[in-house]
């Protein structure tokens, strides 16, 4: 018998129909506990009326048969007995409830790092899980006794820094729930990475506000983009490059952990989304770095929460649910390709051939996620090397890719062919041939291999024209590059991350041995 029919029959029975508890079916576990406790303790109630144990069961099931009602005695005893049951049930419920940790609706200080971002509440079925988000993470509004400093803005929203409190608050303008969901998952991954593998290179989530559409993170000194521009203007030592090498190796471990262990592919790794802390002084050295901004992240095939729901306790009587939807799983090719500056060449070839992900309904595999994210991380490392490391011999920095604004920031075929030709010309002068980089083939992109993969004869002809143009304009420049010894390890790492063979990009032998 369903709950509605139970409640209906109990109310129609005429017992305390005006009481708010009369239409409520007790929880089964409470029913069993109360029934066993009453049977063990006594057979008569405090009014001296003998109670049949089967009458308890009939009350809980809501089946009040007319012939059996007389076992309770007169109606006066029935009402007092029903009140006694409800009183005992209230006591059991009070004992069962654990006192909730008090939390303030205002954010008045820097939140501490939580033990868990969310915990498993129940399993709905084999593939669907219900999680409870830690209630202490949510706040209604900020009430800090300081004025924030504007840090930046864009299509994503606005970021402000509270220096005294040492937090960064990101106000999301569009698609807040999607970014919140991915940030919650990434925040839990950050805690797992720190506790299991001591990886501290995923930005942790400190708090969030659904009414204000805000995310709270630890504050960092700057992003990697600002750091390498600053690095290009100072006197660098070997310690600077060793710190950069260690930082990008740790970031590589974090990327592999996100894709393989957490089933989360970032899809937007770049210098602007890597946040760093540096030492004080005129020649700052990298101390640590984290990967942030999971607004474009997707769950891949290694994820175990593809059909999950996350419940956020906003107030005592309001719960906001965040569900993993199709947009968090299915890759959209245009979003994966992005602006093309940090994406691997195989994605550009797919775009030129018109293949993409149009007929694909499954998530990205973890191997695809690793190859995309590691290549983007390698492109970020290449920007640092070329802008801050190669300006010893040249007064200007060498670009790692053709400039996007020349093509009005549109993903046109000539722009993609330009990138492919430029990488074929540049990387053969930078990437070293070592036992690590050559284990899975030649590390740089080769023109003859790309030419064979292009389906259109027009694209092949335009690709050859770009190669000829770069041979005229950039050959002497690239031949004159002088690679300093302290850059060899960094270039080897970049060659692995940006390897022409996607299998080599995990850099297993280098990162985990």
UniProtKB/Swiss-Prot annotation:
Disordered: annotated span: 1-27
GO cellular component: host cell nucleus; viral tegument
Top enzyme class: transferase
Keyword Nucleotide-binding: yes
Residues where ATP binds: 151-159, 170
Enzyme Commission code(s) on record: 2.7.11.1
Biased composition (Polar residues): 10-23
Molecular functions (GO terms): ATP binding; protein serine kinase activity; protein serine/threonine kinase activity
Alphabetic keyword roster: ATP-binding, Host nucleus, Kinase, Nucleotide-binding, Serine/threonine-protein kinase, Transferase, Virion, Virion tegument
Location of the active site: 268
Coiled-coil region(s): none
Function text: Multifunctional serine/threonine kinase that plays a role in several processes including egress of virus particles from the nucleus, modulation of the actin cytoskeleton and regulation of viral and cellular gene expression.
Family, as annotated: Belongs to the protein kinase superfamily. Ser/Thr protein kinase family.
Name of this protein: Serine/threonine-protein kinase UL13 homolog
Organism of provenance: Gallid herpesvirus 2 (strain Chicken/Md5/ATCC VR-987) (GaHV-2)
